[in-house]
Amino acid sequence: MKKNKLAFVDVETTGIDHEKYEIIELGCILVEQNWDAAGQPEFKVLDEFEFKIKPERIEQADKVSLKINGYNEPDWLEALSLPDAMRIFADKTEDAIMVAHNVAFDFCFLAKAFSLTGVTNKMHYHKLDTISIAFAKLHLKEGVDRFSLQFLCDHFGIENKKAHTALSDCRATLELYKKLMQI
């Protein structure tokens, strides 16, 4: 039986450009994926966590982005510094394959954060993107004309109660991944 450790990751940010904006929330669910003798996937959640991260340049934030992800100063008073968050994240995700919905977006922000803090990224170099997997499996399916996390959650009947919060989006991405692996 082949085992893989997967890190379902989501970042919430102060804008969409990783060169200009910063991470304000980081969520992760660590999962062991096994394949049984019949080739069916099995999933075991090992850990899950979410950090609010103190923004250093909140005055430069995109107001629309802050509204979407629900940023408000009082909720971030006890937030971690970026270096502290990245150290914990790196230790917890060691050797895990990163999985995200639009993995390039999340990884660009993480790579910048690792660089800024001097923390070493310990994740496996392979990454999985649920948008790419969904496109490969569903692009010819009638009625599937978008690949946003919300659209695909609706399509598969996955509830995402707190969309655009890091841990909730991680949970939705994990459930989406499970559905896609069944196809």
Question: Language-model features: where?
Answer:
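Ser/Thr-centric signal marking residues that sit
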Residues: 11-14, 130, 173
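Conserved protein kinase catalytic core
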Residues: 16-18, 135, 175
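A short alpha->loop->secondary-structure connector
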Residues: 114-125
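Short alpha-helix plus adjacent loop in nuclease-associated cores
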Residues: 128-143
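A structural motif
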Residues: 142-152
